[in-house]
Amino acid sequence: MSSTDNFFIYYLAAIGNPNIDYKIKILKHNLCYIFNNIKKPYDIIINCYDDDCALPIETMLNSLSFIRNIFIHKKKGILVELWNTNPHHDILKNYENIFFILDDVKIINMNIINLIFIKKTFNISFLSPKVIGGTWDYMRKYNNNVIGFANNIEIFCLLFDYNDFMKFMHINDINNPWTWGVDLLLGYYNIKSAVYYNFSVKHMLPSNSNHGIAGGQMATYLNERGFKSVNDVNEKYKPIYKIIQCPYPFSSLLPFKRKRLLYKNKMILLNK
């Protein structure tokens, strides 16, 4: 893979029934949205937990000329069970930017180039857009050009580099495959995380998790790390601990133009 091929990869956390036709529509919307934004072909990794869904997914992907390489991991299981067995994770080290997203999350308003710029400028490990339809109010609290630095980010849509992606894999636990509670402990793990509220995604479907099982697994996950409850975590690690106005007018950031941007005497190079 040449250096010109590795700017961006779309990572679909998991996909399958129910509602597969609708989820494929969301996926197609997101892929087209991103291509219209970055104007460059890119690759995709998919975790598919339902064999019956693989063919219609591949058919849709093959209809999109801008999707270059398709890597599909087919296995029955829940999120962490799929990730821990995905044979394609090694290729992720070749990519500058990994766009991690759930199958029922739709992009509403986003500029990938600007999101990357924010991540690099502020040295953020886990960066999320505003999430409409999530659980917590602080994920959608603001509607303007602000960044919320966070100890807790709901895991719907995150921008990573490879090292950040591996951090995310590492903090997950096979005994907590639904991932509940992992988002609460980003401050505990000392992972610099933030929400950029000017861009948004929307959670389009109700959770398919088994709430009783997932909740019990979360309680164990938190207890093993010294926390009695969600409230206990939030008392020690405030979900949003700092809000700043994003200091850049993004109208000048043109996609895929070589551009050096100076922030506090630090040179940031985008679109190498």
Label each residue range with its predicted role.
Residues 93-106:
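Short beta-strand-to-loop acidic/aromatic patch adjacent to the donor-nucleotide binding site
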Residues 48-53, 105, 130-135, 199-200:
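Short beta-alpha junction loops
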Residues 1-59:
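N-proximal low-complexity "stem/linker" segments adjacent to membrane-targeting elements
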Residues 107-188:
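Conserved catalytic core of nucleotide-sugar-dependent glycosyltransferases
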Residues 100, 126-130, 193-198:
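A structural signal for short, well-ordered beta-strand segments and their strand-loop junctions
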Residues 7-30, 176-272:
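C-terminal catalytic/acceptor-binding lobe
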Residues 46-96:
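Active-site-proximal specificity loops/subdomain of glycosyltransferases
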